[in-house]
A protein has these predicted regions:
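N-terminal beta1-alpha1 ligand-phosphate binding loop
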Residues: 1-9
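A short beta-strand-loop structural module common to alpha/beta enzyme folds
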Residues: 10-24
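Anionic-ligand binding patches
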Residues: 26-158
Length: 158
């Protein structure tokens, strides 16, 4: 996210905060995943005196009987403006979907599935299932671009 902001914003200053999403450990559905991103952005804006804050959240959703990864982002401004954007979606293999549907969080399921640790903080499930052509960071960077693009449309002189 910082690389995108450095490209698009004038002299940005970054404050990285670990704020709670206040949704399930494994958000299920677009609504809950988006709510997690909203909660993170609002909380980050509240905790620090910032011009804007980003909230990003990954989750899973059902579509036509298949379980997909989904991800959402929110840009919240100090003036209370909110910009929303969703990212790429990809179906999960049956065995991964079954474990997540039974109540397990995707991160630990992916660690078992791949026999690797730290999947959620590295390539993510999307990296595993796209042969690392698209990584978790790529998905969230795309969302940040969508958010900033909307913001710049409303604030062309920034």
């Amino acid at each position: 996210m910082q690389s995108i902001c450095l490209q698009l914003l004038k002299d940005p200053v970054f404050i990285s905060l670990d704020v709670q999403s206040n949704v399930s450990e494994q958000p299920f559905g677009d609504e809950e995943t988006l709510q997690g991103a909203l909660n993170r952005a609002k909380q980050a804006c509240k905790e620090e005196q910032v011009h804007m804050a980003f909230g990003l959240e990954g989750g899973v959703k059902e579509l036509n009987g298949q379980l997909f990864i989904c991800n959402w982002g929110v840009l919240q401004t100090e003036a209370g403006e909110q910009y929303l954007a969703g990212g790429a979606q990809l179906p999960l293999p049956r065995e991964v979907a079954l474990a997540v549907r039974s109540g397990e969080e995707l991160g630990p399921v992916m660690e078992r599935y791949t026999n690797q640790t730290g999947i959620r903080h590295n390539e993510g499930a999307v990296g595993v299932f796209t042969s690392n052509i698209v990584k978790r960071a790529d998905m969230f960077e795309h969302i940040v671009k969508l958010l900033l693009g909307q913001y710049f449309k409303d604030h062309p002189n920034c």
